[in-house]
Amino acid sequence: MSAQTVSAPEIDIQEIPRARKRENVVLNLKAGDVVVVRSAREIAETLDENGTLDSLPFMPEMLEYCGKQFRVLNRVVQSTIDGAFLAGSHTESYVREFRNNDVVTLQTVRCSGAQHDNCQRACAIFWKEAWLRKADDIAEVSESNGSSNSLPRNLHLKTTTQPGKYFCQSSEFLKATLHLPMGKRIKKCFSAIAARNISVWGMMKRLFAWAWWRTYYKLIGESVRGSLEKTPTGVLDLKPGDLVQIKSLPEIKATLNSRGRNRGLHFSADQRPFCGQQFRVRNRADNFIAEGTGEMKHFQNTVMLEDVLCDSACFAFGGCYRSDLLYWREIWLRKI
């Protein structure tokens, strides 16, 4: 499916008053809080003509979660953008914060990519607080009971902007976020602790990791690098559920070039701690929408593993709270 919009029966988004859009919904959600995703009708009231709130798209893949209850995974006090995008001609900041600082992720909720030509990036979905309510808020429950949970008619949620250019939370990440200067990043460390994203000890370890790898990179260079000019391919034909062991660091280094890449894919310092451990394959990563550009990219012999997440602790002061899954070349893995 490669349509410009995805439609569903009952409300035209352009006919809905924008009262809630301008209303600052403040829930101050913390990790572990129980929330309910508002009805499709309520959420539609917050969206502009592009289907966004503060430039963050509400995607058609999110409709299935309306009315359901979840726990907050993280308050996204700060986040990072894919470094591969910034490696081009772009000079945007690597560490960013969402407009209005009111975004959370929910446990187990990831984008299926079903309405974006089956993108397999499996991003953790970002939720504005205006799209949620606290599960124990009696007044909100009463109000929500009067709202339609049926899918809005003519609710046009864009999936592409032009042929070959997709429209989603990842493609619009830069527009939905702001540069985060170092002074504010220090404050964000305290915000992350207050939001229960991380413990004080956990934050101290993150800051130590950042200082260590920043010094290492300045003095020595790439943290994990090989010596190959042309890097090899490994084919395991892995499928979801397969049990694998991540190879040792020396074995992985033997597949990399001097920039720490295997056929263009970077093996980062954040992946080092997982070497030697066993995990199950979550999904293949053959097709994914590139951060910032909206273009569909294609990988070969690459998978994502269950619960193996990037926290950017080695590169971003204070880390990242978007819980991205890491990419793994099959040549870095051993099937059990």
Name these PLM-found stretches:
Residues 2-26, 31, 41-153, 157, ...:
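Basic/aromatic-rich interaction segments and small domains that mediate binding to polyanionic partners
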Residues 35-36, 104, 244:
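Generic structural signal for buried aliphatic residues
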